[in-house]
Amino acid sequence: MSEASRSAMVSSTRFLAWAMLCLMAATAPVQAEAPAPSSDARLLQRIQEAARELDYSGVFAYQQGSSMQSSRVTHVFDGKSERERLELLDGQPLEFLRKDDEIQCLLPQKHAILVETRTARDRFPGLMIGGADQLMAHYDVSIGEQLERVADRDCQVITLQPKDGDRYGYRLCADSESGLLLRTQTLSPEDDVVEQVAFIALQVGADVDRKQLKPRWKTEGWRVVRTSLNPVDLADLGWTVGEPAGFRRILEVQRSMGGKPDVKQVMLSDGLAAISIFIEPYGNGNKHPQQTGPGARGAVNVVGRRLGDYWITVLGEAPTGTIQQVANSISYAPAAARRH
């Protein structure tokens, strides 16, 4: 696969990556009553609770390889309801407004607002998809002895070392005072940083100005697009999707938006990392790369392949081998064939 084709495929899936942020719905899976959490689990849970329950406003940088993008986030919690505004400061303007589980994605260049229910996956400074105990089944947790400094705040270093090669490792730094996640680094099997997100300026607590929750854009007259999401059982439709060790299925939906062809989506998670599979009709005006194969942008690896009349995209924050394994596991047997 040529470098140009690889780059084109990665770029063509950027919308899907953004869809994971603003257009993906999931309810948290029902979990059995868990035993009392360990001290490490409580520390990870504190990070998650801080992201949801604290008032904070700041600018963070997201680095993937040689590229970097900055964003501004403002989050407030009144004891019952969350409100959040996230604004991309580089590249094409893009803004996310959230009130509890509803997310609006503002696209000023198209004068459009995309509306959908929030995904189960929290973005930075959130951390986990599932509970801390689920995460610890697949990662060894170690706590650093010395504090570090991020955004002019002391933070505690926590390292999550994967127990197998199917997932990345992580090095976190959580605010020693509030528990808020200040930096997360994604680590390769060689312990190299392949991606990181870190605050570069931050306010926490009463100093947060709630006026910063207001959108920059006047959206009167903008087109509002609501994505229709319907639960679907892909096995009943003839699809088989393999799950890497430790990953489990947390989402299966068919999504419809405007007059575009329906897209089926499966989301797998180990409690921290997530892998999404998108299944859409091949052709019919859809733009797909001329070549299949893997591509990468930072820690996010992506594999695209054609399967009969469908195009399959698998992407997620997992090593290339894991993403390729999922892509290779996907098969389809039409209903007529399965009856014989």
Predicted regions and their residues:
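N-terminal mature ectodomain segment of secretory-pathway/periplasmic proteins
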Residues: 33-111, 137-186
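Sec/Tat signal peptide C-region and signal peptidase I cleavage site
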Residues: 28-32
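Surface-exposed amphipathic alpha-helical segments
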Residues: 178-180, 187, 191-210, 312-340
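Acidic/charged, solvent-exposed loop-and-adjacent secondary-structure segments enriched in E/D, K/R, S/T
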Residues: 105-127
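Bacterial N-terminal signal peptides that target proteins for export
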Residues: 3-17
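Bacterial N-terminal signal peptides
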Residues: 17-26
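Short, solvent-exposed recognition patches
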Residues: 220-308, 320-321, 325
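Extended beta-strand-rich segments in extracellular/periplasmic secretory proteins, especially
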Residues: 129-187, 192, 221-266
